[in-house]
Amino acid sequence: CVNIIPHMQSIYRWDGTIQQGKEALLIAKTRADKVHDLNARVRSLHSYDMPAILAIPLLHVDADFAKWLDENLG
């Protein structure tokens, strides 16, 4: 399950200079045991040398959503 938020303005330092441009934000929901595989897949598809891939721990996940996610991740 992913959400793609297009047309975001990004400002960052790269190679010693401030860069800016349009990017998209991908939010992918998965389990901790799938993070490594997801990271590898995103890196293989991404055009950047060093994409910002973050795993954020959650304080709460709705039980129905967690069940659905488990059923669909296999």
Residue ranges and their predicted role:
Residues 1-74:
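Positively charged, small/polar-rich N-terminal and surface patches that mediate targeting and assembly
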